[in-house]
Amino acid sequence: LLKLSRLFSYNDLQRQKLSRSPRATQRVEALMAGDWQERLLSLLADEIYKVLGKLQEYQGMMAQRNMDGKQVEAIIKAGVDTVTLSRQVQKRQWDFLITSPPYLQAHEYIRCAKLDLFWLGYSEEEIRALAKLELPYRSVPAVPIYSETFERWQSQIDEPSLRRLYDNYFYGVLGALTVLSEQVRQRMFLFVGRASIRSQPVPIDRIFTEHFTALGWKHEATLIDKIVARTLFKAEMNPATGLKDHRMATEYLVILRRRDEHGE
């Protein structure tokens, strides 16, 4: 229902904030032309069948693994804070950690879900409180970052607000990942992108790699994926800085392996 509500909304789905756009208006007018109720029910039925199909596929895979003697259990947690949760997990309980940390200067992920939250009955005060919990906008304790690249970039940032944003991002993300890494027995797969500060891409993948290799992990590879399609609109100039807008052209998958007792 939320997905359909977005489709029938005047909000531009390609922007990170609420805004009414000519493109969205044309989309809604096209949907409303003719029997829009039948169109709505048809789209709803399609979405329901998609969910049921995925659920059936998942249950079939789980049943097959159980028949093969490989008991599978999944624990799903929602609405949790990673920074807090990272301190509550048991040691060495996972074989792998696969995650995509938030981007630096993501400008509030909550913006993408703000309209949905309003529809679900959340107040503006509650939504504003959620936005303040996001990295790198929340206050987090400083933690050691074992990376020369991190220190070099840190020394080059003169603006206090950007320096605080930069520090909070790595203190929050690497602080949580470092604690979580202690629970991983084999490998970590970290998907990151080189977001920019003042139009300069920050080599976040390199900082992550240097930090974890200093902690004893082996860097097996960094895979690079070119971003072909984008959801968000692109502007020639960044309105916040007045500089040329630089969107990430690639994303990086950093693969790290825990060394054995022989250091291999």
PLM regions and their residue ranges:
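Conserved beta-strand signature within the Rossmann-like core of class I S-adenosyl-L-methionine
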Residues: I127-A131, Q186-G193
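Short, well-ordered beta-strand micro-motif
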Residues: I255-R257
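Short glycine/proline-rich turn/loop motifs
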Residues: E151-L162
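Acceptor-substrate binding/catalytic loop of class I
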Residues: L162-Y171, V192-R206
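A short glycine-rich, Lys/Arg-flanked "PGG" loop and its adjoining helix->strand segment in the class I
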Residues: Y171-Q186
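Nucleic-acid modification enzymes, centered on SAM-dependent nucleic-acid methyltransferases
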Residues: L1-E148, V202-P203, F208-E210, T222, ...
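Short alpha-helix
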Residues: G175-T178, P203-L215
